[in-house]
Regions:
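Hydrophobic faces of well-ordered beta-strands that scaffold small-molecule active sites
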Residues: 62-66, 86-89, 119-123, 154-156, ...
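Hydrophobic alpha-helical membrane-insertion segments, chiefly the h-region
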Residues: 12-26
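Acidic-and-aromatic substrate-binding clefts and catalytic sites of carbohydrate-active enzymes
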Residues: 65-73, 93-104, 128-137, 164, ...
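H/E-rich (His + Asp/Glu) clusters that bind or coordinate divalent metals
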Residues: 39, 229, 234-243, 247-389
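An N-terminally biased module of ancient metal coordination in phosphate/nucleic-acid-related enzymes
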Residues: 23-118, 137-138
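Active-site gating/metal-coordination segments in enzymes
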Residues: 44, 52-54, 102-224, 276-279, ...
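N-terminal Sec-pathway targeting helices
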Residues: 2-14
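Active-site gating loops and adjacent loop-to-helix segments of metal-dependent hydrolytic enzymes
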Residues: 34-39, 58, 82-85, 118, ...
Length: 389
């Protein structure tokens, strides 16, 4: 362990809390994946986990991207110990491992009810029925009922743009006019749209074992667009997402998974500059921040300190053991804290990574304040993002 990292992390976390959230700072083709650090043997990083988690918990962290569809008091106890709040997100997936959408939503609601106030609901809708005449009306009625019962956000998923088609075979994009009444209803109710649109660039590239997503596409070939050249290109899907943002300036949109602009933070920055109603979460894409140049990522997170929400994409599924979930959740939170809040050097998936050691107020905003701003209702704070006209 480096001498820099030996300073007590609890002191660091208290400094972050004291600093508060206010910080005033200025705000041609797919890239090929390149490792930005030397490969090294993987080593377990568990000896400092309790200290890391104590520092993490001091911020009352918010994980804005979780899929929890099973109850267990040990998970609830963990959330209490970590002072953790989560957004439990439902997904409308024809290939779902979560069960039918109704079953999935019921399980999420049961988890939230048992969470002792530590979880809130992000609902979704069935996009495969979008061609039906009353689709928009029924969907608006559905999400309005869910809002009345406590849901605070709505998700659209990557099947919009990559799988859902019209009866005549046209791929449906996220800016399709059929969705406009739904987006207007979300904005009118002061809720947030969580948009998982498109996929990492590796989805359209030849297989590369060095890619962070190699195993996912190996196990889920239906989403590996390199093998489906007749499907829309990523550029087309992201352009439709950008049009959605432009057409709905009063709609708060959180782009899941770094907004599918994971390989270069400059691409995210361009959207932030163009669309004040847009933020991103880090769910399942922290590794992409680790492999980009350290100072570039650090400067990006400092400059756009109010626009990046902490998220993980952690799961707790009906067939998963609580022991496995506890291990995964704690390891993920400890590792992400180490990367964002310290300058420690550590091994992750065979790469040597140095922590970003972000300023204390920026760390607090990423782990807590930004979720409060962009997803009102995720805790009891009245703060929310103000979208300028």
């Amino acid at each position: 362990m480096s001498s820099d990292f030996k300073r007590p992390l609890l002191i660091l976390s208290l400094a972050i809390v004291a600093a508060g959230a206010a910080i005033h700072l200025d705000s041609s083709g797919p890239p090929t994946f390149r490792a930005a650090a030397l490969k090294a043997p993987q080593a377990p990083q568990t000896e400092d986990q309790p200290e890391l988690l104590r520092a993490f918990a001091a911020l009352e962290p918010i994980d804005s991207h979780v899929h929890a569809f099973k109850n267990d008091p040990e998970i609830t106890d963990l959330m209490e110990r970590l002072r953790l709040h989560i957004l439990d997100i439902c997904v409308a997936d024809a290939h779902s491992i979560y069960g039918s959408l109704d079953t999935e939503t019921a399980r999420a609601k049961a988890f939230i009810q048992a969470s002792r106030g530590h979880a809130r609901l992000c609902v979704t809708f069935d996009p495969y029925s979008f061609h039906q005449k009353d689709f928009a009306q029924k969907t608006v009625e559905l999400i309005s009922r869910e809002f009345a019962e406590g849901a605070i956000a709505v998700k659209i998923w990557k099947n919009i743009g990559m799988e859902v088609k019209t009866p005549d075979g046209r791929y449906v994009m996220p800016d399709d006019p059929a969705f406009q009444p739904i987006y207007r209803a979300i904005a009118k109710n002061n809720k947030t749209l969580v948009a998982h649109v498109a996929e990492p660039w590796s989805c359209w590239q030849p297989p590369n074992p060095d890619s962070p997503d190699y195993d996912y596409y190996k196990e889920n070939p239906q989403w590996y667009m390199y093998m489906h050249p007749d499907h829309p290109r990523k550029e087309v899907i992201l352009a439709a997402r950008d049009h959605l943002l432009a057409e709905n300036p009063k709609l708060r949109v959180v782009g899941a998974h770094l907004g599918s602009m994971e390989t270069d933070v400059d691409d995210i920055a361009k959207r932030f500059d163009r669309y004040p109603n847009f933020a991103v979460d880090t769910a399942a894409r922290m590794e992409y921040l680790m492999i980009q140049p350290r100072e570039k990522v650090r400067n990006f997170l400092i400059k756009y300190h109010t626009r990046v929400l902490y998220g993980t994409d952690l799961e707790f599924l009906p067939d998963e053991s609580v022991a496995d979930a506890l291990k995964d959740w704690q390891e993920t939170y400890a590792r992400d804290w180490k990367f964002l809040a310290t300058n420690a050097t550590f091994q992750y998936r065979g790469r040597q990574v140095q922590g970003l050691d972000l300023p204390a107020p920026v760390v607090r905003e990423i782990f807590h304040e930004n979720a409060v701003r962009w997803i009102p209702g995720i805790d009891s704070s009245p703060k929310q993002a103000v979208i300028e006209p």
